[in-house]
């Protein structure tokens, strides 16, 4: 059997308490029983060691100093002739707390190697054989519970010293605070302060993304192609999915509100409240059109409860009482391609002098700059890497609509002064509107130019906008000469000639007017008018379909008001017999059908078909079975329609006002306030 190099018993004895070589040294060596137990029971039985603790141990001579004594010099390994391996130690080990031994000097358990960190000299460390009462407890210099930064330092300390696993007071400061529970607290004053934890960080312009509760259908799956011409699917009874999503998203945008501290910081401006920031860019200082830092908000009017768009000009000071006179002229203009101005006023709600303009609000509207040049304002946008280049058909549509807006503006003796890609919004499919009209008239009221000159500037800005869209070049980097040459190669000569007419100054013999412009593009005006008519026909057809759905809804409300009238249980004239009993069974026939296995049948086609036949009153007979399956009725839809009209007529008479007023007292139902809209 192989033997080890060192005897384990001798090595353990050397580490614990080295035995003196001679009896001459025992009188100065303190007995270990005194250190461990406080007394030695062999003191009077021949123990050769010293038992007097007050007697200090003399400083050992250099010749008798032990190799592994705590007072020995720090071990420094000799330099090897061979290159040593590079050691890797944590950078945080240098800042570790100095270890002070508790009772005895910490002696190494083996021979140190070249890879170990040098032990600092223990010059001020108390001797291992000094008084126990004078020994200092281990106290770390700094408590750091970050495992990522203090892992190396913590590894050099003895974790078993003064550790109580059931005491958490030392780490209480590092533990997270208890989460606020709004349901367990009776005091709800802290609900607002703790409510921000349930939402993302409230930044400027942040809007809540929690959708409202839309109780709308969500069709799943494609259309069936194996239907016969006389067959219909569920989709045929409702509006198209894309139109429904568009309307639903606009409703969602209209109902969005700000949350957290951002909502509390929004003031009430005049008669407008619940302000929501609509700006999509944080670069406010680049507003070169107005010359002021502008902000756009969505707000609710306190007078009409309608939504409006507010544009704020920060730091504008009104120096003339007549500066708001142009607003009256702009409020008279009504055009399908102009965002109508509602009001203008000054406010100090933000602590400065700001000028506010109120316009009509169109949810999910985006500017031409955002739609066609998304990368110009978003350097790291998640949208498409290429701009949305407008085709020539779309360009002619824009030209016709802007011409329509200019015709309405110029005919009233005004100038648009806002034909810019950042001030023209898209509110529908290729439907654009001029926004911010009239703001420059208020700002430059004291520096007004002749109206003919301002209208001429409208034509020039109009031409530059079309060139920018045709060449897919942002307005800031547009080289007009090269852009027109490029447009001539990619587009028709008619479009190029129209743009040159807009950019060139008028001839000496005449003046440029919108009528002259419309006369030159009359062919494209007819094309745009035809597209508008077809769009109107499509919307009307969808409206007709929803009217049919409204008829079904009114019939359902009548059936719901007739069935299960508990307040008339004791009324002999309103007992569930005869016609009313058949209506109750008809409800089960339409909505409570089951299959052969007793599972509910959910067939929208069956429900709509039965309700439509009931609304018309056909002669078709159906069999109504009682719930106990003992009685059957053969009735026609015409008879059921008469029963509905008769029973509902009695309810109208009993209401007292013919419009669904309060029911019999003591029923427990809420009192309904009639209005002119309560018509069936």
Swiss-Prot record:
Entry GO MF terms: ATP binding; poly(A) binding; protein kinase activity; zinc ion binding
Region annotation (Disordered) ranges: 1-26, 51-87, 99-120, 655-680
Keyword Nucleotide-binding: yes
Sections of the chain in a coiled coil: 523-561
Residue ranges of the region described as Pseudokinase domain: 256-522
GO BP of this protein: mRNA processing; nuclear-transcribed mRNA poly(A) tail shortening
Biased composition regions of type Gly residues, renumbered to the chain: 655-669
Function according to Swiss-Prot or TrEMBL: Regulatory subunit of the poly(A)-nuclease (PAN) deadenylation complex, one of two cytoplasmic mRNA deadenylases involved in mRNA turnover. PAN specifically shortens poly(A) tails of RNA and the activity is stimulated by poly(A)-binding protein PAB1. PAN deadenylation is followed by rapid degradation of the shortened mRNA tails by the CCR4-NOT complex. Deadenylated mRNAs are then degraded by two alternative mechanisms, namely exosome-mediated 3'-5' exonucleolytic degradation, or deadenylation-dependent mRNA decaping and subsequent 5'-3' exonucleolytic degradation by XRN1.
HAMAP family hit by this protein: PAN3
Protein name as it appears in the record: PAN2-PAN3 deadenylation complex subunit PAN3
UniProt source species: Pyricularia oryzae (strain 70-15 / ATCC MYA-4617 / FGSC 8958)
